[in-house]
Amino acid sequence: SIEEAQERAARFAKGMMAHTAEPQGRSMELYQAFVSAVEQHAKTNSDVAFYADCLNVSPRYLSQVCRKLGEKTPKQIIDTTLLACIHQELMLTTHTFQEIAYGCGFTSQAHFSKFFKKLTGMTPSDFRRQNKK
């Protein structure tokens, strides 16, 4: 009958949606775990392979998930998170640039300044001057 056919079609559609929703859920879980790990370790580790290893996935798969759900590469997410930490340090503390650089995992103040300027278009000292209250 038509009703039976509609019922079967509805069950089939529901099964298909459940099947496709599952990977999305796992991807979202991985993405959230990645973002959480980055927030915890951004100052000490900026290597995508480190996070992929912690999450038991390949860097390539992590990259696919991040691009799909966050519309950024893992490296962009790491750098953005690190930059937010640096912004806080520059605005809320009187630490020297060298102290902030080493505290955020940079090997030198020059590398820190270059990273900051590349992402913001200004030097750490210009940023601090403009944002100090």
Residue ranges of model-derived segments:
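Basic, amphipathic alpha-helical hairpins
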Residues: 4-17, 33-47, 65-66, 70, ...
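Residues within helix-turn-helix
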Residues: 49, 60, 96-99, 109-110, ...
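Core residues of bacterial helix-turn-helix
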Residues: 55, 104-105, 116
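Short hydrophobic/aromatic patch on the recognition helix
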Residues: 62, 111-112, 116
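Terminal helix-turn-helix DNA-binding modules in bacterial transcription factors
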Residues: 68-107, 129-133
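…primarily DNA-binding HTH/wHTH and HhH modules…
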Residues: 114-133
